[in-house]
Design a protein with these regions (language model features):
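Core of compact, soluble alpha-helical bundle domains
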Residues: 1-63, 141
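Short alpha-helix boundary/capping elements
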Residues: 20, 47-54, 83-84, 114-121, ...
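General "foldedness" signal
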Residues: 26, 30-33, 60, 67, ...
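Amphipathic protein-protein interaction modules
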Residues: 58-108
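Amphipathic alpha-helical binding modules
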Residues: 86-142
């Protein structure tokens, strides 16, 4: 998967992994352990990554010249909606003065975030498969 899209996906996935660990700590929020600042940092970076996810996907599809174009364009709409919905949920969490483990656990459980993560895993596998087929080693290996 080309760089910008890959980087955005990585930031979002890293945030989700940190959120899982944070949710399991049972923090009421505002503790002096520094985790409150870290969760805000992860969420802020994820929000930035979510904001440009659709355009990064569109760039990859265009750059790779993927055809037929219709399924990729239709999925772009799904990805845009899921990214937008996830961004709203992340921004709502960031707007809270205290971010507890329970709040993050509920954010983790959000169907919006789960749908987005599934979208990311799906496009990652699709683009990996395309790149493998187009690489000289992949093309040679598929001839057997």
């Amino acid at each position: 998967m080309p760089n910008e899209l890959s980087e955005r996906c990585s930031v979002i996935e890293e945030c989700y992994e940190f959120m899982l660990a944070y949710a399991g700590q049972g923090l009421a929020g505002g503790e002096g352990n520094g985790q409150g600042g870290l969760i805000r940092d992860f969420l802020s970076r994820a929000a930035q990554a979510l904001g440009g996810l659709e355009s990064a996907y569109a760039s990859v599809v265009k750059q790779m010249g993927l055809n037929p174009a219709e399924p990729y364009a239709a999925f772009q709409e799904v990805l845009a909606r899921d990214a937008r919905d996830s961004l709203v949920a992340v921004e709502l969490a960031l707007a809270q003065p205290i971010i507890s483990s329970q709040l993050i656990d509920n954010l983790n459980a959000s169907i919006h975030l789960r749908a987005l993560l599934t979208d990311l895993f799906l496009i990652d596998e699709i683009f990996k498969g395309i790149q493998h087929r187009e690489s000289p080693a992949g093309a040679a290996g598929s001839a057997h």
